[in-house]
Amino acid sequence: MFEIHPVKKVSVVIPVYNEQESLPELIRRTTTACESLGKEYEILLIDDGSSDNSAHMLVEASQAENSHIVSILLNRNYGQHSAIMAGFSHVTGDLIITLDADLQNPPEEIPRLVAKADEGYDVVGTVRQNRQDSWFRKTASKMINRLIQRTTGKAMGDYGCMLRAYRRHIVDAMLHCHERSTFIPILANIFARRAIEIPVHHAEREFGESKYSFMRLINLMYDLVTCLTTTPLRMLSLLGSIIAIGGFSIAVLLVILRLTFGPQWAAEGVFMLFAVLFTFIGAQFIGMGLLGEYIGRIYTDVRARPRYFVQQVIRPSSKENE
């Protein structure tokens, strides 16, 4: 029987990218939610290379009187999950909660996650109820969730929702993983002994626009396929075997037909030969592209470059920059 340790301090990690309109409300509501916990807390806001006034607003928030905000400024945009990992490396709490800055997932749900974690869960996930996203975003999210469930075997309902709670030992385990392509909810479930999901509200986006464009969603799909499993490589081998057997069968058939109907028929079968040839060429290019994705990720990981660079950290207890 494992001993369940009560949560003493909560760290809220929020990546920020061009969210100057939502920041004042985000800080106010998140602070209010954390105050209601009756526990120690800190709010880590990571500026992911914003081009608007977000970084300056974060610095001011950290330097305000009685502030609980830690501002982490990255030198450029590294992506949502890399920014969250940067926040993980600076947390001091024993329960870490991640939250998006767009306020579509209400900060008021934080106490519910803390209460569920106090029951002994390593990871507390969430499922968005009555999603207020476009049809395209909903469809893409369903496809990604199904892909993850098939490749990992983990029956979690909503991997795309970043409102989640992680015990400190789960975060420490994730920080020991150095691959560049990181999808935090999946990585956390690899190390979690006990995980659960709870339903949460989902609101319309009041400020700005979603940072996930069509191309970024496509890139996310590639990341998930190549960083989660080697199943596509096995499928590629199976496909190659099927094509090879099919090609050999067609070759035997063509020889038989030529012997049966004579060389005149063979001339009339030129277009079929071209069709078969182009099928093989297309399959080869698909295989080469897939192998290239894996090799490219191996090359990126072997170089061992840092996944982010922290330019500055501003803590409320000290006005000095780290």
From Swiss-Prot:
Keywords: Antibiotic resistance, Cell inner membrane, Cell membrane, Glycosyltransferase, Lipid A biosynthesis, Lipid biosynthesis, Lipid metabolism, Lipopolysaccharide biosynthesis, Membrane, Transferase, Transmembrane, Transmembrane helix
Segments crossing the lipid bilayer: 236-256, 270-290
An annotated GO BP: response to antibiotic
Main localization (coarse): membrane
Xref: Pfam families: Glycos_transf_2 (PF00535)
Reaction(s) this enzyme catalyzes, per UniProt: UDP-4-deoxy-4-formamido-beta-L-arabinose + di-trans,octa-cis-undecaprenyl phosphate = 4-deoxy-4-formamido-alpha-L-arabinopyranosyl di-trans,octa-cis-undecaprenyl phosphate + UDP
SUPFAM superfamilies linked: Nucleotide-diphospho-sugar transferases (SSF53448)
Catalytic activity, EC: 2.4.2.53
Subcellular location: Cell inner membrane
Known pathway: Glycolipid biosynthesis; 4-amino-4-deoxy-alpha-L-arabinose undecaprenyl phosphate biosynthesis; 4-amino-4-deoxy-alpha-L-arabinose undecaprenyl phosphate from UDP-4-deoxy-4-formamido-beta-L-arabinose and undecaprenyl phosphate: step 1/2; Bacterial outer membrane biogenesis; lipopolysaccharide biosynthesis
Keyword Flavoprotein: no
Annotated Gene Ontology cellular component terms: membrane; plasma membrane
Membrane topology value: Multi-pass membrane protein
CDD domains in alphabetical order: DPM1_like_bac (cd04187)
Membrane topology (Periplasmic): 257-269
InterPro entries (UniProt xref): ArnC_tfrase, Glyco_trans_2-like, Glycosyltransferase_2, Nucleotide-diphossugar_trans
GO molecular function (one): phosphotransferase activity, for other substituted phosphate groups
Gene induction: Induced by BasR.
Cytoplasmic topological intervals: 1-235, 291-322
Keyword Transmembrane: yes
Function: Catalyzes the transfer of 4-deoxy-4-formamido-L-arabinose from UDP to undecaprenyl phosphate. The modified arabinose is attached to lipid A and is required for resistance to polymyxin and cationic antimicrobial peptides.
Family under the similarity heading: Belongs to the glycosyltransferase 2 family.
Identification of the protein by name: Undecaprenyl-phosphate 4-deoxy-4-formamido-L-arabinose transferase
Record lineage: Bacteria, Pseudomonadati, Pseudomonadota, Gammaproteobacteria, Enterobacterales
